[in-house]
Amino acid sequence: MKKRNISLKSKIEIQKIFKEGNLIRFSNLNLKMFCKSNHLIYSRLLVTFSKSFRGSVKRNRVRRLFKEAFRKRLELLEGRAIDIIFVVYYDRLDLTYFSIESLMKSLVLMV
């Protein structure tokens, strides 16, 4: 699958997911996840941050980690077209690749 198919970019679709999507909170990681099934044949991802999340370098690193973990778990989501939005709230949070990978594993089981 091409990289551009993974990203969720339409403002209208993003607002629809925030309104109609299922909310899952991960209180130990200070992050929320919104998910909703879509009309496409593949799943898409968006990682967004609160305004209190400072530092573009750290923000982009966390975004890259989420996208890579999602890309690796994409074959487990085959047949289930889902739009997923992660909202990260705390910039002092120490998100490692392994914690994000385990989060994606649990996501696949939940969905």
From Swiss-Prot:
Its EC number is 3.1.26.5. Transmembrane segments: none annotated. The keyword Nuclease applies. SUPFAM superfamilies: Ribosomal protein S5 domain 2-like. Coiled coil: none annotated. Belongs to the RnpA family. It holds the Pfam family Ribonuclease_P. It catalyses: Endonucleolytic cleavage of RNA, removing 5'-extranucleotides from tRNA precursor. One of its GO terms (cellular component) is ribonuclease P complex. HAMAP family: RNase_P. RNaseP catalyzes the removal of the 5'-leader sequence from pre-tRNA to produce the mature 5'-terminus. It can also cleave other RNA substrates such as 4.5S RNA. The protein component plays an auxiliary but essential role in vivo by binding to the 5'-leader sequence and broadening the substrate specificity of the ribozyme. Consists of a catalytic RNA component (M1 or rnpB) and a protein subunit. The gene is rnpA. One of its GO terms (biological process) is tRNA 5'-leader removal. Keywords: Endonuclease, Hydrolase, Nuclease, RNA-binding, tRNA processing. It comes from Borreliella afzelii (strain PKo). This is Ribonuclease P protein component. GO terms for molecular function: 3'-tRNA processing endoribonuclease activity; ribonuclease P activity; tRNA binding.
